[in-house]
């Protein structure tokens, strides 16, 4: 970000008018910038696509342990007085050797911990959402944030989860992807996410879902989408509410809801002709205006307004513009406008782009109760 701020003028940009945006891990990085004080002067607006993670970040001790395992695998842990930290030894390794070390080291990591942001007490004094909860973040930056309808379907497909899951298969699958529940909790989740909608949770109609995936598969991917504190609508709602409470000048939430039919993404889990899911990363081609990558007709036409929203926000902190359906600012259920938790639903067809209120409300209310509030949040504000 510092490099961009300093050098973007050479590319025709304005270093004092930067919008930072990213998707997935890139969205995580943008969230980090919102909480990282050194970044505050380097951008004016932020876009977080499928990146509102609320699962903490590695501690310095975690990172040091990971580095020690790399040293051990690379046989670089004893550098002697000339190389006490083993860095010179590591720098001599070729790319193939480094790759082999990384692959081997990955097998040693806990399932919930990879290479990522570190709470080092300097750049990040606490996990980003803990800082935002405490009001210790960049309150001057307007934010666009959102998710895809079926985020975790990508991972279930990519990792080969049985497409015809039964109830027992669901129970076995949830903890593999980070959603643990006792018997009482699991029973409550099953009621909330019932495929027949009796718990207040909406699925595509049976005629649209088809029979490629079983009912329990749909329930599993939606429980994970909204229950794992990283990607889905509930994490995104949690972030939006915190930003609103913290005083962010404008928050715009979206839900991308179109199953992409284009054949331009062979091998991408959940995309392609006949697709019925809207997996992780579905929105990217539309954000970049990639109509040529999309199926002709309504799908390709959706790219123009989606891209326009992003460009308008980057230019003036407001995604709205001539000819576009109105994208309301986010307000929570008690907001002055009384709009409820409003998102802009992005889909094809007449009325496909429209404000939607109280998205997955009962499920997200329950997921919020499952999330333990951080201790001593008030102390974090003093760090800023």
What spans do the regions from the language model cover?
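Short, well-structured alpha-helical segments that form the helix of a local strand-helix-strand
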Residues: 24, 86-102, 189-190, 307
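Amphipathic alpha-helical segments that form well-ordered structural scaffolds
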Residues: 3, 66-72, 89, 188, ...
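Catalytic-loop region of hydrolases
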Residues: 90, 95-104, 109-115, 362-384
């Amino acid at each position: 970000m510092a490099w961009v701020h300093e050098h973007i003028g050479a590319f025709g940009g304005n270093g004092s008018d930067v919008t930072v945006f990213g998707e997935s891990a890139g969205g995580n990085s943008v969230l980090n910038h919102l909480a990282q004080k050194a970044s505050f002067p380097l951008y004016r607006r932020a876009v977080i696509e499928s990146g509102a993670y609320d699962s903490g970040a590695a501690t310095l001790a975690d990172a040091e342990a990971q580095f020690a395992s790399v040293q051990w695998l690379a046989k670089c842990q004893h550098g002697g007085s000339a190389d006490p930290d083993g860095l010179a030894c590591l720098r001599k390794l070729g790319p193939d050797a480094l790759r082999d070390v990384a692959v081997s080291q990955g097998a040693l990591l806990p399932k919930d911990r990879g290479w990522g942001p570190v709470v080092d007490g300097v750049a990040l004094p606490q996990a980003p959402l803990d800082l935002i909860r405490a009001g210790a973040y960049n309150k001057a930056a307007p934010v666009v944030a959102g998710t895809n309808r079926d985020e975790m379907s990508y991972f279930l497909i990519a990792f080969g989860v049985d497409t015809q899951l039964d109830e027992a298969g669901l129970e076995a699958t949830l903890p593999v992807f980070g959603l643990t529940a006792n018997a009482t909790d699991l029973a409550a989740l099953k009621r909330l996410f019932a495929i027949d909608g009796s718990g207040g949770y909406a699925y595509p109609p049976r005629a649209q879902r088809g029979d490629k995936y079983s009912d329990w598969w749909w329930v599993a991917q939606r429980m994970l989408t909204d229950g794992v504190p990283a990607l889905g609508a509930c994490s995104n709602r949690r972030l939006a509410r915190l930003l609103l409470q913290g005083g962010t000048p404008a928050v715009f939430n979206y839900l991308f809801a179109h199953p992409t039919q284009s054949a331009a993404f062979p091998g991408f889990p959940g995309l392609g002709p006949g697709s019925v899911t809207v997996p992780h990363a579905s929105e990217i081609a539309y954000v970049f205006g990639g109509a040529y990558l999309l199926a002709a007709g309504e799908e390709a036409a959706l790219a123009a307004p989606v891209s326009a929203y992003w460009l308008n926000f980057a230019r003036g902190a407001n995604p709205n513009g001539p000819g576009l359906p109105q994208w309301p600012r986010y307000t929570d259920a008690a907001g002055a406008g009384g709009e409820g938790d409003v998102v802009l639903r992005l889909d094809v067809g007449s009325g496909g782009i429209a404000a939607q209120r109280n998205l997955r409300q009962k499920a997200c209310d329950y997921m919020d109760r499952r999330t333990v509030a951080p201790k001593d949040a008030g102390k974090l504000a003093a760090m800023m």
